[in-house]
Amino acid sequence: MKISAVIFDLNGTILEDEDEYGRAFNQVLKSLGVETSAEPPQIKGIGVKENWPHLIKKYDIKTNKSLEQLAHETQEAYLTEINNVTVRSGFDEFVENLKDSGIQIALATSNTWEIAEKVLNKVGLGVIFDAVTTVEEVAYGKPDPGLFTLTADKLGAEREKCLVIEDSASGISAAQLAGMKVVAISGRDEDEQILASADLIVENFSEITAKVVEEL
């Protein structure tokens, strides 16, 4: 079946920013008295706010701060890192190839619009998408399929004709629950087992073309 739309995740998929978010989380953890390793402590594919219950439990954190406040502090720390954020190799060429083939492109992110807009504008991708959906627009984040089904509705695209490009297990699950094909972007060797249920796994956008997408 011919794919009519490609829906991209943002953080860790279009953007190589796992380490930048890791430093942001670690900065807030340090302010709470937690010393962590240099490794990013967050769970990929879920929102910043949604990460904090996991981190509070993992590090047995005692704090009066709300999840909203912890998320706000994390996002503020991330914004100090956005000069270091880069676009994944091959993305611009892949998008141009999709557009030349008449395939719509959209963004579905677990992030907020405020943060997504700032980082997209910073890396020069602020106006390329036919539709954008952020976590504020749905009742539940990934792995719930709502982000992707709403995005398909915005595009006027049939769900089974949509392809999602993701970098996390929760994102892959969400796309599959939405009835969509999935390409997984694997940034680290250890990710491939986690991403194994995807229809295709690649390391960067240089490995895929509109022709590959249409044949999935």
What are these regions (language model features)?
Residues 106-107, 184:
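Hydrophobic beta-strand core positions in alpha/beta domains
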Residues 13, 109-111:
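Conserved phosphate-coupling serine/threonine residues in phosphotransfer and NTP-handling enzymes
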Residues 41-42, 60, 81, 106, ...:
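Short, flexible active-site loop motifs that bind/organize anionic cofactors or intermediates
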Residues 1-4, 96-99, 112-113, 117-216:
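Asp-based, Mg2+/Mn2+-dependent phosphohydrolase catalytic module
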